[in-house]
């Protein structure tokens, strides 16, 4: 029987790498918890900045945080005022030196997490789930994806009974390890309850990182 697994975790060290780049002999749980708090804080503070991922690397005396965003201007603010405020809050929160870098995402339409968040935001604005899914799929394929699969689960359209709706275009080979598949998940908080949005984007085959 086939089992569902996270496509990103399944391909770690084959074509993907970790978002936390550090090693610890001691205090592993403390540092892991710090990473979790950092990501949660940055995502919450810049919810509308379309953040695809936050990569954290630790050195002896500084923590390097790379924020990948489709709207870097929203994070930086006028003359870098907003980013300085965020740095100060993070330093207070984890009591360590921070080096914060904002990296622009060139093609946000191909990032599964950004597609999922975009669909979730549309559902919260009461846009039809079918229209939101179809529009996102078309935009993704137009930019150059080989295939995309989207699922919405919950009380869709305010229905009494929860169900799952799927929309798929092109090829999404989940069983092929060398297939570069991006995965994203988001939740839409509607008046009828939470709707879960999952997105798989197939970007083509890639050589493994070991080759």
Curated annotation (Swiss-Prot):
One biological process term from GO is: translation
SUPFAM superfamilies associated with the record? Prokaryotic type KH domain (KH-domain type II) (SSF54814), Ribosomal protein S3 C-terminal domain (SSF54821)
Q: Which residues form the KH type-2 domain?
A: 38-106
Any one Pfam family match given in the protein's UniProt record, by short name: Ribosomal_S3_C
> What domain of life does the native source organism fall in?
Bacteria
Keywords (alphabetical) are: Ribonucleoprotein, Ribosomal protein, RNA-binding, rRNA-binding
Tell whether Ligase is among the UniProt keywords.
no
Q: Which GO terms describe its molecular function?
A: mRNA binding; rRNA binding; structural constituent of ribosome
Q: Which residues form a coiled coil?
A: none
Q: Do you know which CDD domains this protein is assigned to?
A: KH-II_30S_S3 (cd02412)
One GO cellular component from the entry? Answer: cytosolic small ribosomal subunit
Binding partners and assembly? Part of the 30S ribosomal subunit. Forms a tight complex with proteins S10 and S14.
Describe the function of this protein: Binds the lower part of the 30S subunit head. Binds mRNA in the 70S ribosome, positioning it for translation.
Listed HAMAP family: Ribosomal_uS3_B
The record's family statement is: Belongs to the universal ribosomal protein uS3 family.
What is the protein's given name?
Small ribosomal subunit protein uS3
Organism in which the protein naturally occurs: Ehrlichia ruminantium (strain Welgevonden)
């Amino acid at each position: 029987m086939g089992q569902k697994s996270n496509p990103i975790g399944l391909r770690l060290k084959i074509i993907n790498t970790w978002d936390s780049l550090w090693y610890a002999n001691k205090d592993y749980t403390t540092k892991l918890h710090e990473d979790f708090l950092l990501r949660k804080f940055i995502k919450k503070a810049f919810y509308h900045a379309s953040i695809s991922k936050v990569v954290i690397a630790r050195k002896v005396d500084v923590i390097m945080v790379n924020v990948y965003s489709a709207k870097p201007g929203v994070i930086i603010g006028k003359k870098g005022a907003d980013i300085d405020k965020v740095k100060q809050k993070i330093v207070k929160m984890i009591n360590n030196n921070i080096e914060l870098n904002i990296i622009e995402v060139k093609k946000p339409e191909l990032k599964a997490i950004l597609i999922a968040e975009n669909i979730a935001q549309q559902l919260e604005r009461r846009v039809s789930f079918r229209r939101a899914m179809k529009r996102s799929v078309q935009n993704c394929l137009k930019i150059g994806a080989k295939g995309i699969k989207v699922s919405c689960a919950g009380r869709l359209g305010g229905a009494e009974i929860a169900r799952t709706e799927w929309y798929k275009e092109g090829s999404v080979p989940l069983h092929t390890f060398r297939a570069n598949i991006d995965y994203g998940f988001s939740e839409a908080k509607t008046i009828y309850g939470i709707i879960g949005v999952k997105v798989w984007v197939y970007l083509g085959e890639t050589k493994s990182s070991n080759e």
